[in-house]
Amino acid sequence: MTNLLFAQPKQNWVDSTYQSLTLEQKIGQLFMPMVFSQGDQNHYQKAISAIEKYHLGGIIFSKGTIAEQVRLTNEFQNISSVPLLIAMDAEWGMAMRISDVSPFPFQMTLGAIQNDSLLYQLGQSMANRQRRVGVHLNFAPVVDVNTNSKNPVIGLR
């Protein structure tokens, strides 16, 4: 249940912020390019320029380390005129994209678990880890139907 005491001020902020945007800025809010947190300075500079020039709505992080992703998240949020939506494609946890975190089991393994409570706790743990590093949205779970046992992409995930 939404706490109505706090819902109205947030809604007012959203409405007033949206109304203050130009058409170009509103269009920019629709875009979320991918940024590699293990990229080089040139890669980061391009991301910063895109945030400033196109008024991006968010960033999708991929490949890197936690420290670098947190640093970039803070830097990008500081230069953006509207808070960015930070996302990852981390269907089996952040270890899918971040090198210095412990992995969770692959989806095929989780599908064999009969304990819904355990699966719920695992999902909570994944969400908590991502929240701690500033991720708002995980593009997961997904439905990958493995119709070819030799599929190198889907495999056990």
Language-model-detected regions and their locations in the chain:
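Bacterial Sec-dependent N-terminal signal peptides
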Residues: 1-9
